[in-house]
Amino acid sequence: MLLTNEQIEIINSQEKEIKIIAGAGAAKTTTLVEFTKVRPNKTFLYIAFNKSVKQEGEKRFGSNVLVKTAHGLAYSNFVSKRYKVVNELKEKDFREIFDEYSDLIDFAEFVYTINRCFELYCHLPHNKPLLPYQIKSTNTNFVNNVNKAIGVVVNKMIKGELPMTHDAYLKFYMLTNPQLNYDYILFDEGQDASPVMLRIFASQ
């Protein structure tokens, strides 16, 4: 395979951190494959952005490279067989948790607000309460109640009393401050990564 001077420079680099900026079709993955080939005694974790990229990576990388999506990594290390996972929470899930509010005329709106805010919480790279502008309310009491409700949802999920969403277990995995024991971590299509994904890998 004929490599460009730029690719050769990257492959031979001894820098601790390397960022590759290139357009579509610029052989970024090929560069990463060659990077691993010249380091057969090193261990690599290759993070693919989605399932199709992961499947392609599994075909191209050698045995010293573990290929995972970020969610796949979190699932295997945090979820395993301990938790039930769903694509999204339903109204019945919230109705069981917040039974005292279930007779409210605007319960559907209550569920929508908690669900939306919980999804936002799952995308933030920290464990701080949501701010008023994020909840879209200037009512301090309402903001506090929403944050309390999010805390209830989190605790129920951790205890296994409520199924986890995919973004939830990724967030919970991040909060464990995982240490990934690989010589190199390769993050393909990093520009599309969520703040939670970036927090996991930037903290290594």
Each language-model region and where it sits:
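ATP-hydrolysis module of ASCE/P-loop NTPase motor domains
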Residues: 82-158
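P-loop NTPase Walker
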Residues: 1-83
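Conserved helicase NTPase motor core
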Residues: 4-9, 18-19, 145-204
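Conserved P-loop NTPase motor core of helicases/translocases
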Residues: 66, 74-99, 170-175
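Short, charged low-complexity intrinsically disordered segments located at boundaries
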Residues: 42, 85-89, 181-182
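Non-catalytic, well-ordered alpha-helical scaffold segments
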Residues: 51, 68-71, 75, 105, ...
